[in-house]
Amino acid sequence: MAAALRFDNIGKVFPGVRALDGISFDVQAGQVHGLMGENGAGKSTLLKILGGEYQPDSGSVLVDGRAMRFPSAAASIAAGVAVIHQELQYVPDLTVAENLLLGRLPSALGWVRKRDAQRFVRERLAAMGVDLDAQAKLRRLSIAQRQMVEICKALLRNARVIALDEPTSSLSHRETEVLFKLVDDLRRDGRALIYISHRMDEIYRLCDACTIFRDGRQVASHASLANVPRETLVRQMVGREISDIYHYAPRALGDVRLSARALEGDALRAGASFDVRAGEIVGFFGLVGAGRSELMRVIYGAQRRTGGALTLDGEPLDIRSTRDAIRRGIVLCPEDRKEEGIVAHASVAENINISCRRHGLRAGLFLDRKREAETADRFIKLLKIKTPNRRQKIRFLSGGNQQKAILARWLAEPDLKVVILDEPTRGIDVGAKHEIYGVIYELAKRGCAIVMVSSELPEVLGVSDRIVVMREGRIAGELARGEANEEAVLNLALPQGATAHAA
């Protein structure tokens, strides 16, 4: 019996880069096949070929034994294939129902029957166990909720082959469990699934088989993961042993650099108070909706502050805009790097030099292009940013390499005092995480106060000197590194009445 999906010797070349070279593996009906590899290894490129966005330069894609050519996304969908990419694809000013049924809204005599559409979507969402308002506009939803809409859109197409690229990167624990149930149901229903994730727990929980990519090549395939240690997968992905991914080392801390007292904003009603010392890394943990990102955006001047006070090195701090924050040496690496972190149409060099261009002026009039080129080349080499050259458009880089470029932007800033990192390793592979943690520690050694928001509890525990836990828009507690463990943190993060054991 033919495999539901087969990749046969797939190759793809971009200018200066061989993105895929000889990729061959099968996905059976009723199987979840994991794909793992560092950012830039070629996983997402393969899915774009499957989804009709790219055409392979060699090899073929077979669906149910038939060689297929997908000149467009519509052709892929018509063949029973659904691909959910990391970069969410939605219309922000349309409702959940309209996004889910885009192109197939029920109509009568040319008029859309919105009531029928909303009822249909509500019924299907309820059947999937997904709690979303069918009438809510996408722009008003959180990133996690938008991700669920994308997943539901693929499921509504009743596709036989479904590919998921980092589907849980923005989901809460509850939403992740809903997704896992959906994947299990689809497997039992005989669908063939490809599942890309950097999270080992998810690969071992969901996947029947797994293929490892490195530098565009297929370096290993496992028909079963039952007897494959995690260390083996990591070594195959990165080509080396990583004994301590966090490489934490105690540091001498300075005086209090950033202090917040009874800080309030539109989504922060209780008043948040905390300190961060020079050279200290303070991790902020909480469930989705706890208010962590909102607090950081208030500090950075991206959201309105309605109460409380901030001080920087003991001096009152009045930040009314992000420009004020940057001028005072406070920067933010945002959660949504695609929308807020990078300038997608600009080059890698331009993205690295954006913040420090005021230091690169010559005679007050002209940009020092030579100095900018040298700065970009230095950080591309230092942070191992995978790019053909500094002139490459940053949108063509993997998520991990985009994040490195954002961090390089602030490493190049000479007057940096406070660095706020909101989900700095979301959707990034284990090798790139290791390198980014090194950058974070380098910033701390320079005396920067580091505030790191993360939904990955092992990351918070592994990197932070101190952990602040938020719950329902307020600070629920604080733990020193020596007293912090998963149970203690979760007991502070969970709603009152729940416990870590119950979770």
From Swiss-Prot:
The keyword ATP-binding applies. It is found in: Cell inner membrane. GO terms for cellular component: plasma membrane. Gene3D superfamilies: P-loop containing nucleotide triphosphate hydrolases. GO terms for molecular function: ABC-type L-arabinose transporter activity; ATP binding; ATP hydrolysis activity. Residues 5-240, 253-497 form the ABC transporter domain. The keyword Flavoprotein does not apply. It comes from the Bacteria. Its main location: membrane. SMART domains: AAA. It is a peripheral membrane protein. It catalyses: L-arabinose(out) + ATP + H2O = L-arabinose(in) + ADP + phosphate + H(+). Keywords: ATP-binding, Cell inner membrane, Cell membrane, Membrane, Nucleotide-binding, Repeat, Sugar transport, Translocase, Transport. Its EC number is 7.5.2.12. Belongs to the ABC transporter superfamily. Arabinose importer (TC 3.A.1.2.2) family. Part of the ABC transporter complex AraFGH involved in arabinose import. Responsible for energy coupling to the transport system. PANTHER family: ARABINOSE IMPORT ATP-BINDING PROTEIN ARAG, CARBOHYDRATE TRANSPORT ATP-BINDING PROTEIN MG119-RELATED. The complex is composed of two ATP-binding proteins (AraG), two transmembrane proteins (AraH) and a solute-binding protein (AraF). This is Arabinose import ATP-binding protein AraG. It comes from Burkholderia pseudomallei (strain 1710b).
